[in-house]
Amino acid sequence: MPKGTSSKVLANNKRASFDYAIEDTIEAGLVLTGTEIKSVRKGKISIGDAFVRFDGGEAILWNSNIAHFEQGNRYNHEQLRPRKLLLHKKQIATLMGSVSRDGYTIVPLKIYIKNGYAKCLIGLGRGKKKFDKRDDLKKKDAKRDIDRALRDKQKY
């Protein structure tokens, strides 16, 4: 596949914006095996339950499910294996310092292909309380009602 300048989003973590107030985002590279990248390019990846932890000064993506490649036979990968994220040392240090505070975690927001490489947009998020989620739902419903009213007004 030729390298292009465009990026194609393959997986979105919609649950992350509902459960966490995202304060900062960073783009990280993904270390994948041959059958993993083929499955990712087909869009067979799920990051709904995924999270990032640090082990020995490295950022590792846990619980990301990449489906088996159909033609991979015995060389297929393990679906739920931990995958290394490629970040600069300074980025890892700042993220480790941020996560050490109470209530903060790092979650993947998007998986996409950029210039032929698999990338992961990770976000530093603070967990939302139940009332925060309800407030967000109320705002979302109000915005939807306003948009609907404006759309109906433009029709007539």
UniProtKB/Swiss-Prot annotation:
Biased amino acid composition, Basic and acidic residues: 132-156
GO terms for MF: RNA binding
UniProt main location, coarse: cytoplasm
Gene Ontology biological process terms in this record: trans-translation
Domain of life: Bacteria
Localization annotation: Cytoplasm
Cellular component terms (Gene Ontology): cytosol
Keyword RNA-binding carried by entry: yes
Region entry Disordered, spans: 130-156
Keywords associated with the record: Cytoplasm, RNA-binding
Protein purpose: Required for rescue of stalled ribosomes mediated by trans-translation. Binds to transfer-messenger RNA (tmRNA), required for stable association of tmRNA with ribosomes. tmRNA and SmpB together mimic tRNA shape, replacing the anticodon stem-loop with SmpB. tmRNA is encoded by the ssrA gene; the 2 termini fold to resemble tRNA(Ala) and it encodes a 'tag peptide', a short internal open reading frame. During trans-translation Ala-aminoacylated tmRNA acts like a tRNA, entering the A-site of stalled ribosomes, displacing the stalled mRNA.
Family: Belongs to the SmpB family.
Protein name: SsrA-binding protein
